[in-house]
């Protein structure tokens, strides 16, 4: 069976936090549903950009006017704006979006295992635009154990599908 990462966004948790679900299907067919809140995602993106400073030379906005509303690059990404990451040596540009970063988290978990996920009792997220539509999660991302290096690796998985730097 093929591995797969699917993102479900536009969700609210039971405590009314904005959230995302990363559905990760492993080769043996088992799927886990990992919940990450918007706040956790913003922190991880900030850590990833800090952790990638050895290969990211510059960061550029794709939607320059829209990005002026926010104070950090990670806020821009969380609010579904895109940024360009320029390679420190070649100036080659790579586009980072919220979906790409979330997919990178899932691909990292597929590659390195579920150590960064904590199983939890089933929790519920509701679609913001369709509150009657309920999605269940069975894991949370253990962001307290993710440092800047791991976050950078997740970023690379999101951009390239594999580790390219470091």
Model-identified regions with their sequence ranges:
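Alpha-helix boundary/N-cap detector
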Residues: 32-40, 68, 72, 76, ...
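Amphipathic protein-protein interaction modules
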Residues: 90-144
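Generic low-complexity, intrinsically disordered sequence content enriched
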Residues: 11, 15, 45, 139, ...
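Long, contiguous N-terminal structural blocks used for assembly/anchoring
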Residues: 2, 7-89
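Generic detector of well-ordered alpha-helical segments enriched in charged/polar residues
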Residues: 38-46, 50, 102-106, 152-156
């Amino acid at each position: 069976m093929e591995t797969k990462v699917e993102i479900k966004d536009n969700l609210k948790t039971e405590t009314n936090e904005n959230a995302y679900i990363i559905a990760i299907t492993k080769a043996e067919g088992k799927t886990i549903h990992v919940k990450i809140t918007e706040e956790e995602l913003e922190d991880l993106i900030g850590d990833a950009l800090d952790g990638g400073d050895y290969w990211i030379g510059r960061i550029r906005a794709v939607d320059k006017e829209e990005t002026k509303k926010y104070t950090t690059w990670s806020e821009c990404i969380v609010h579904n704006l895109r940024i360009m990451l320029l390679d420190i040596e070649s100036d080659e540009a790579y586009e980072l979006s919220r979906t790409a970063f979330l997919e990178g988290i899932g691909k990292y978990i597929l590659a390195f295992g579920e150590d960064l996920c904590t199983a939890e009792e089933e929790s519920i997220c509701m679609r913001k635009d369709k509150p009657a539509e309920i999605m269940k999660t069975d894991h949370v991302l253990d962001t307290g154990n993710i440092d800047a290096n791991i976050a950078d690796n997740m970023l690379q998985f999101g951009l390239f599908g594999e580790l390219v730097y470091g």
